[in-house]
Amino acid sequence: MAQKHPGERGLYGAHHSGGASLRTLGPSVDPEIPSFSGLRDSAGTAPNGTRCLTEHSGPKHTQHPNPAHWLDPSHGPPGGPGPPRDAEDPDQSETSSEEESGVDQELSKENETGNQKDGNSFLSIPSACNCQGTPGIPEGPYSEGGNGSSSNFCHHCTSPALGEDELEEEYDDEESLKFPSDFSRVSSGKKPPSRRQRHRFPTKEDTREGGRRDPRSPGRHRLGRKRSQADKRKGLGLWGAEELCQLGQAGFWWLIELLVLVGEYVETCGHLIYACRQLKSSDLDLFRVWMGVWTGRLGGWAQVMFQFLSQGFYCGVGLFTRFLKLLGALLLLALALFLGFLQLGWRFLVGLGDRLGWRDKATWLFSWLDSPALQRCLTLLRDSRPWQRLVRIVQWGWLELPWVKQNINRQGNAPVASGRYCQPEEEVARLLTMAGVPEDELNPFHVLGVEATASDVELKKAYRQLAVMVHPDKNHHPRAEEAFKVLRAAWDIVSNAEKRKEYEMKRMAENELSRSVNEFLSKLQDDLKEAMNTMMCSRCQGKHRRFEMDREPKSARYCAECNRLHPAEEGDFWAESSMLGLKITYFALMDGKVYDITEWAGCQRVGISPDTHRVPYHISFGSRIPGTRGRQRATPDAPPADLQDFLSRIFQVPPGQMPNGNFFAAPQPAPGAAAASKPNSTVPKGEAKPKRRKKVRRPFQR
């Protein structure tokens, strides 16, 4: 920034719209003494040779101060000197301060002369620079305090001992307590007298060796003043009152707006009610028509939207199915290519192996792996101490191997000799389940977790492993002692030769008995199945098989005349045809079930017309009472003949000695009439049946 002449620029600190301004009135004889207008200023000469300029405002104020301008922290004090500008050079500012000091001297002389002519007397306040203050002058709008008062504090007399930090802090305190001049005025209209300022006298350190102070630019430091605590409390009280006033005003306007809004809603509701009262019957018809029109429109829009969505859905489903087909085709193609590559690679490897002779080597390798020598070496390695220690380390969990962990998870409760890895708590719980078993019935091999064919070495190894896990000194389980007693009892049995031999003989006897009982029960089961599914034949004195059919008694017989199924009764015997009449099948209702007895009917040589409406024959299962004719039902107390035959075979009783020894016992024919006789079990209906002598029941032989 180029340096300007004092006559070409205004004094710093003058407001752009105020009445106090410094300007030149044209060329003068002395360039250092410019002319002034609009202010009554006074200048005095200090003992150190500097001049002080004191500015006084006019008696009338044409414009009130703007509080917003004072509250803005970006603006400096209106009447005081501001901080140095960033673009100015310190040397230039120092030169300008020297020039302005000369101007201040001239101004002070002229203002003193003018003030004496006006007849105004001012109270002078001595200062370090002998400049006379004017506390009685009304406070102007551009004073430092922001309350319209002019300052008697000369910026030339400011002690340089006040550092930049201290001055800035004082200025910040003043800025926070600035209020509009309206609050500081007295209610009577009189202007309050200005307070007497305390000036800080320079110290010895502040002066130079020649006795003069270090000239500093008045614009380099902001002017600061100290205020009393009472003024601060007063400012804070006024500031709180102003905020409370603004808050009350805002609440009042909010209440007014709320009342207006409620009134508008009430007015709208009244108009609506009044409009509803003036409705006519024709309006309802018009409303119905209007609703119908809009319903039709909405229905049309819904139909269009539904069609659009359905078409989109169908298109999406079609695209998705096509995509799935394409994906499946690509996967099949990739699978085919992969299999083709595998086949080609395998053929290439086989051909390469044939050329290099790898096939013979592979055959030799597999044969060597299957050789007895290698198996013997593996067995010796498995029985060696290093291998056993390694297995023990793995069992205790000191060496965690992934394949061993999988083996543990898979085997679970496998025997210890086959590689079972269990926790001590699991072993204690397993042994406690056998604590209530008597010692005579205890299975020592099951307790030790080994097979019954285990050797003495395997038994001792299993006992040691379990003893380490369940011993009360090693395991802190509350019932570890009971588990160890069970283990000790099992070890006493297998460790003593006599006890072990006795246990093995007892086990062999139990096994033999159980085997014989199992054989008997299996044979009995087979005989019962055979007895339940066979029928006695009086012609061949044998048995024929019968097959249970999946038919209900209510719909058992097929009738060709009615083309439907008829119900059947107990003992009914009928025939049905199949395969265009080429195959005849015989059925009977016995024990509430329908059976296929074609084999028995073929042996009896029974001829029955198939698919008839009436039942042609009836089977009798019990003895007839003399003097009765017609159908005979089996008595519920009479046992079946096949079960009697089965019992007779068990107790070795001939069938002829038992009553009702067969199903259909034929009567004893007379001599010479054997050829003409027929089995009485298949006597046609309506014919007289020969009477049979009642047999005496005999008890079973025991």
UniProtKB/Swiss-Prot annotation:
Composition bias, Pro residues: 75-84
Main location: endoplasmic reticulum
GO molecular function terms listed in the Swiss-Prot or TrEMBL record: dopamine receptor binding
PROSITE patterns tied to this protein: DNAJ_2 (PS50076)
CDD domains in alphabetical order: DnaJ
Location of the protein in the cell: Endoplasmic reticulum membrane
Keyword Chaperone annotated: yes
Ranges of Low complexity composition bias in the record: 659-676
Annotated Pfam families: DnaJ, Jiv90
Biased composition (Acidic residues): 88-103, 165-175
PANTHER family: DNAJ HOMOLOG SUBFAMILY C MEMBER 14
Function: Regulates the export of target proteins, such as DRD1, from the endoplasmic reticulum to the cell surface.
Assembly, per entry: Interacts with the FxxxFxxxF motif of DRD1 via its C-terminal domain.
Protein name: DnaJ homolog subfamily C member 14
Taxonomy of the source species: Eukaryota, Metazoa, Chordata, Craniata, Vertebrata
